[in-house]
């Protein structure tokens, strides 16, 4: 008497058995999706480096907070993330789980990174400050001293400071306030900032310190590394380019978008 009519615009899928459903989910999970627009992904970010669909820059989910406590993580792989950014380390902890961390300078495959220490680790081996103040260890700012170098600074509200995130950059501790409520430190630009002492940071500096000395000499290779090649205005003709020609003229500077 009644008929079940399915709309053409409906995206509902019906499965006869449970095994069919899970096989479909497994197929969708490991399926390599290439969008129709080869220059952007589903979130609207530029991920494709070439329209030939040969190169793809993945947006890695990097664990900045390291909320796991008392774990020793083994570095299994070092990867190049983005241009002017530190290397990314794929680590495996004692619970056999994988995660991406920012690799400190001087760390290679096979070394261990320590997460936030537990209460037992603070009083281990007699000298608690000496034990947890190791390179690549995630520590609280209260255990830092003058002239210590840190990176990956987090505020007490678990918010990453948008400072010293480039390759080879770091924070330098100047002194602690008399009331011991904040630390005074410098950023790579030379600016002096104040950070609450309840924050967290990693001992050391960002990796990829020789990034500014790397010269490939080819615009096509730099394009796949995340750098957009720009043509100098001197190399353009002023006939068909508004910003072309020499600058030693009475005419003011103009941008390419201005008619």
UniProtKB/Swiss-Prot annotation:
Record keywords: Mitochondrion, Ribonucleoprotein, Ribosomal protein
Gene Ontology CC, one term: ribonucleoprotein complex
Disulfide bonds: none
Keyword flag Ribonucleoprotein: yes
Domain of life the protein comes from: Eukaryota
Renumbered residue ranges of the record's region Disordered: 234-259
SUPFAM superfamilies per record: Nucleic acid-binding proteins, Translation proteins SH3-like domain
PROSITE patterns registered for this protein in UniProt: RIBOSOMAL_L2
InterPro entries the record matches: NA-bd_OB-fold (IPR012340), Ribosomal_uL2 (IPR002171), Ribosomal_uL2_C (IPR022669), Ribosomal_uL2_CS (IPR022671), Ribosomal_uL2_dom3 (IPR014726), Translation_prot_SH3-like_sf (IPR008991)
Ribonucleoprotein found in the keyword field: yes
Family: Belongs to the universal ribosomal protein uL2 family.
PANTHER family registered for this protein in UniProt: LARGE RIBOSOMAL SUBUNIT PROTEIN UL2M, RIBOSOMAL PROTEIN L2
Protein name in the entry: Large ribosomal subunit protein uL2m
Origin species: Paramecium tetraurelia
């Amino acid at each position: 008497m009644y008929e079940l009519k399915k709309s053409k615009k409906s995206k509902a899928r019906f499965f006869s058995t449970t095994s069919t459903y899970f096989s479909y989910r497994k197929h969708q999970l490991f399926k390599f999706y290439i969008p129709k627009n080869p220059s952007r992904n589903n979130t609207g970010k530029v991920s494709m480096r070439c329209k030939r669909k040969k190169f793809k820059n993945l947006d890695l989910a990097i664990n900045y907070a390291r909320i796991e406590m008392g774990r020793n993580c083994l570095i299994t792989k070092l990867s190049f993330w983005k241009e002017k950014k530190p290397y990314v380390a794929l680590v495996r902890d004692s619970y056999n789980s994988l995660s991406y961390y920012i690799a400190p300078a001087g760390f290679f495959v096979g070394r261990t990174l320590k997460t936030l220490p537990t209460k037992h680790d603070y009083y281990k081996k007699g000298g608690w400050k000496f034990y947890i103040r190791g390179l690549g260890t995630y520590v609280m700012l209260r255990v830092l001293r003058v002239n210590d170098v840190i990176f990956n600074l987090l505020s007490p509200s678990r918010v990453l400071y948008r400072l010293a995130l480039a390759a080879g950059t770091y924070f330098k501790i100047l002194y602690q306030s008399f009331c011991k409520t904040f630390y005074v430190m410098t950023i790579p630009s030379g600016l002096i900032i104040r950070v609450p002492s309840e924050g967290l940071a990693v001992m050391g500096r960002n990796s990829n310190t020789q990034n500014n000395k790397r010269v490939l000499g080819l615009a096509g290779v730099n394009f796949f590394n995340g750098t957009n090649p720009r043509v100098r205005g001197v190399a353009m003709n002023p006939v068909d380019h508004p910003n072309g020609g020499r600058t030693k003229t009475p005419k003011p500077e103009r941008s390419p978008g201005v008619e």
